[in-house]
């Protein structure tokens, strides 16, 4: 009799698990209720999701610390579970967060919103799309569409939140547009491709040698000697009128070029690849553009610096097989207790 009771208990427990799994899959609900669960690879996409979904969804980001580099992040079992439990995933795409793409590939029922695909990014193109002023607006539109399809009774709520968020986003595009007259046609040296979308949107230019330098820095390589010599001459002659310095990646060549720029009074704008702790995406972008405005208005620029842990570039595979990225501090033991970069 006891064996039968034990067998019955096991079968009943297993049945309850199956029923629970089935109800979660069919309803699209998370374990904590009927709210849609949204997971993002990095924090600035979580910000979009929270702004639009409000209290109608649970939103979480796998990476929320400045000190973590998304290129070669290694997700934990808990990260995999969080993705598996989600209904919607927002990723950067373009190979930037390939580990997240792999996690979402294992979840058949998850709806994916891929920023790179929304922009029509091709393989091998610059994956730092959050500096493209269009991307957040496109993600907001797509998320609103997906949420409205899943939860049609709150469609007006999502659309109103989207409109409010896009109104805030317009502060960035308004700022960019206000700078175009003074920025247009100026030659800029970007130490790495991070800021290139912003450079394009401002109407600035980069020489062929600078483009090769930025790519070499990103891949952890040295530029060709002749290219380096040409860049040095472009700085001395002030053909290059601005240095855009990614503070999270450096090498000896970059340090020397920045020193040369300072000697020749070519101003420096410091930018970051990842969203600084304690700032929203919009605050982060506006802060950098405001500093650029000061330079364009005749300011001397900033003192160049590099954060603790900034090393000699990083190698990128722009496909979807992951990245090796040495320009940041990588301690993934605890996402919330990461050692922070100094900003």
Please report, for each region that a protein language model flagged, where it lies by residue.
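Extracytoplasmic metal-acquisition and chelation regions
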Residues: 3-10, 17-343
């Amino acid at each position: 009799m006891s064996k039968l009771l034990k067998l019955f208990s096991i079968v009943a427990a297993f049945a309850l698990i199956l029923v629970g799994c089935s109800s979660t899959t069919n309803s699209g609900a998370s374990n904590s209720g009927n709210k849609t669960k949204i997971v993002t690879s990095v924090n600035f996409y979580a910000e979009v999701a929270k702004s639009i979904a409000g209290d109608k969804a649970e939103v979480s980001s796998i990476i929320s610390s400045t000190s973590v580099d998304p290129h070669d992040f290694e997700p934990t079992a808990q990260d995999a579970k969080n993705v598996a439990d989600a209904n919607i995933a927002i990723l950067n795409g373009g190979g930037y967060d390939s580990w997240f793409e792999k996690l979402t590939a294992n979840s058949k029922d998850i709806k994916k919103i891929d920023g790179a695909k929304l922009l029509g990014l091709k393989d091998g193109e610059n994956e730092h799309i959050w500096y493209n002023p269009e991307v957040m607006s496109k993600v907001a539109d797509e998320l609103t569409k997906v949420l409205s399809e899943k939860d049609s009774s709150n469609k007006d709520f999502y659309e109103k939140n989207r409109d409010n968020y896009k109104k805030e986003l317009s502060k960035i595009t308004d700022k960019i547009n206000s700078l175009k007259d003074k920025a247009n046609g100026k030659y800029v040296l970007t130490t790495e491709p991070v800021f290139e979308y912003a450079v394009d949107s401002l109407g600035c230019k980069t020489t062929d040698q600078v483009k090769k330098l930025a790519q070499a820095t990103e891949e952890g390589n040295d530029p060709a000697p002749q290219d380096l010599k040409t860049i040095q001459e472009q700085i001395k002659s002030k053909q290059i009128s601005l240095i855009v310095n990614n503070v999270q990646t450096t090498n000896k060549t970059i340090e020397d070029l920045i020193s040369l720029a300072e000697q020749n009074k070519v101003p420096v704008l410091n930018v970051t690849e990842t969203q600084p702790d304690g700032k929203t995406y919009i605050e982060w972008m506006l802060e950098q553009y405001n500093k650029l405005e000061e330079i364009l208005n005749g300011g001397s620029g900033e003192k160049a610096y590099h954060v603790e842990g900034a090393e000699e570039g990083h190698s990128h595979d722009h496909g979807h097989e992951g990245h090796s990225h040495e320009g940041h501090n990588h301690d993934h033991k605890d996402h919330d207790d990461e050692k922070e970069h100094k900003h």
